[in-house]
Amino acid sequence: MAFGWIDEQAELRRRAGLVRTLRPRAAGTPPLDLASNDYLGLARHPEVTEGAARAARTWGGGSTGSRLVTGTTELHTELERELAGFCGFEAALVLSSGYAANLAAVTALAPHGTRIVSDAGNHASLIDGCRLARGTAQVAAHADPDAVRKALDGHDGPAVAVSDTVFSVDGDAALLARLAEACRAYGAGLVLDDAHGLGVLGDGGRGARTRPDSRAPTTSS
């Protein structure tokens, strides 16, 4: 069989206890969820659900095309304008998911010849972005700006450091001020995934980047 190896790999994963099973939630399930990313409880907020329903009635159930062709609506541009203003950026770009945003950011900012220094605790989407980018990825010890400096030292070409602001698995935070200082010292860019900081940290929930000790030129997804 051409794909017989799939069954073999599946059996190995089963024996190792790595098989995961989906557990669908029923409508009306009591909203006690200790594993959710919905920190602020906005997913069920009446204004959010009504806004989503109103948008569906106005624009339909899908974009009907890619953003570059026919898929961009006034809602997209309005949201991007408001997000940029809220976060203090010149502009914002909304993608379909955080995973897509990280792949887009890393691959766009790490062309051929770029040294990519990725934190060992980064989310899988950042790791995949590093793998897909045309630069050369090097993993640095978790939350260790000195390790980032060491990885950047001696590289003459373009370089970028990639890190979560708040790491989703352990819940600890990157040392942003020192990380930004290391990047400035070596002329490297800094890409931050603030998915778990935006709305929770910073002035008015504007994200980890807005903390007084961590201001730095960044790209946040």
Residue ranges and their predicted role:
Residues A105-A124, P145:
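Conserved PLP-anchoring active-site segment centered on the Schiff-base-forming lysine
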Residues H112, L132-R134, Y186, A216-P217:
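Short, structured coil segments at secondary-structure junctions
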Residues A2-G61, A188, S220:
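N-terminal "arm"/small-domain region of PLP-dependent enzymes with the aminotransferase-like
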Residues S96-Y99, V117-A133:
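Substrate-binding/gating loop at the entrance of the active-site cleft, primarily
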Residues E50, T58-S97:
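Conserved N-terminal alpha-helix of the aminotransferase class I/II PLP-enzyme fold
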Residues Q138, H142-L192:
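Active-site phosphate-binding strand-loop segment of PLP-dependent enzymes
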Residues G187, H196-L198, G205-S221:
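Conserved active-site segment immediately N-terminal to the catalytic lysine
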